Amino acid sequence: MFKKLLLSVGLVWCLISLGQARKESTVEECEKNIGDSLKDRVCELRQYTPVSSDDMDKHMQCVLEVVGFVDGNGEVKESVLLELLQRVDSGVNHAANMKKCVTEASTSGSDKKANTFYTCFLGTSSLAGFKNAVDYNELLKAGKMQTSDPFDMNRVAALIKEIDDGLC
């Protein structure tokens, strides 16, 4: 009897977890599911324009979660992001910038954390490296680059330009 109850509880937990999993797996899917207030601004947002709105909070949660930089609660995966930032642009103190913006985001509710971090980070000396890191991971998730490919800023920029040109 106890085993059946435990099994049932486990099954329900699995189903609930599946129901809460992010349905999007690429930035493109996040853009397709963007809130109505931002539908006409996708091209602008792809140029890293910060926006304060509930729709942008949801969009940045989606994008940053898909590229692997935040978890489902908007918490920054600091070691993952820092490792890539240092590969992309080693001449900047990304750790200090990240600490500042993670601290700022920690004062926000979980639904606003990703966008708060994003907006803050765009205002730091990590801006160029962050853009490249997001773009690189977007390309990896879209299957346009492989993890075995070394980071090549020119290739990343060219592939992102192709995507942008197709959308905009």
From Swiss-Prot:
Segments traversing the membrane: none
Entry annotated with the keyword Disulfide bond: yes
Signal peptide span: 1-21
GO biological process, one term: sensory perception of smell
Disulfide bonds: C30-C62, C43-C168, C101-C120
Subcellular location: Secreted
Known role: Modulates blood feeding of female mosquitoes on vertebrate species by binding and sequestering different mediators involved in the host response. Binds serotonin, noradrenaline, histamine and adrenaline. Inhibits histamine-, serotonin- and noradrenaline-induced smooth muscle contraction. Exhibits vasodilating activity.
UniProt record similarity statement: Belongs to the PBP/GOBP family.
Lineage top rank: taxon: Eukaryota
Tissue spec: Female saliva (at protein level). Female salivary gland. Not detected in female carcass without salivary glands. Not detected in male tissues.
Record-listed histamine binding positions: Y118, D135, E138
Record protein name field: Short form salivary protein D7R2
Source organism of this protein record: Anopheles gambiae
GO CC entries: extracellular space
Cross-referenced InterPro entries: PBP/GOBP, PBP_GOBP_sf
Pfam families found in the cross-reference section: PBP_GOBP (PF01395)
Keyword Secreted: yes
SUPFAM superfamilies xrefs: Insect pheromone/odorant-binding proteins (SSF47565)
Positions contributing to serotonin binding: E31, H59, Y118, D135, E138
